[in-house]
UniProtKB/Swiss-Prot annotation:
Keyword check for Cell membrane: no
InterPro entries to which the protein is assigned, alphabetical: Ribosomal_bL20, RIBOSOMAL_L20_CS, Ribosomal_protein_bL20_C
Protein encoded by which gene: rplT
Name of this protein: Large ribosomal subunit protein bL20
The species this protein was found in: Geobacter sulfurreducens (strain ATCC 51573 / DSM 12127 / PCA)
Family label: Belongs to the bacterial ribosomal protein bL20 family.
Matches recorded under Pfam families: Ribosomal_L20 (PF00453)
Length: 117
């Protein structure tokens, strides 16, 4: 089997890692071994936190909807149940935005949910 010297490929692989590590502090952006560990960890955190972000935003929306629905005399669960009974298909993101930006509109939606009880 012929010998493979890998000069170009090895340099390209190292440069790819060091490019991803750009902006890291100290040796983590300069030395290949440190940069590899830092980049691996950063990519793992990024992957994990893309999932966590969805959970966090849903929790924030639910908190905002709950606060606004309690101002209208309903709990969050009763509001959601009433909206499902009334066949109002507004998702939590839009409901939370309404609760913050348009309280009157939200209270009209809450009255729709109240009418189901």
């Amino acid at each position: 089997m012929p010998r493979v010297k890998r000069g170009f490929k090895a340099r390209r692989r190292r440069n790819k890692v060091l490019k991803l590590a750009k902006g890291f502090r100290g040796a983590r952006s300069k030395l290949f071994r440190s940069a590899t560990e830092a980049v691996d960890r950063a990519l793992n955190y990024a992957f994990r936190d893309r999932k966590v972000k969805k959970r966090d935003f849903r929790a924030l929306w639910i908190t905002r909807i709950n606060a606004a629905s309690r101002l209208n005399g309903l709990s969050y669960s009763k509001l959601i149940h009433g909206l499902k009974q009334a066949q109002v298909e507004i998702d939590r993101k839009v409901l939370a935005d309404l609760a913050v930006s348009d309280p009157k509109g939200f209270s009209e939606i809450a009255t729709l949910a109240k009418a189901q009880f």
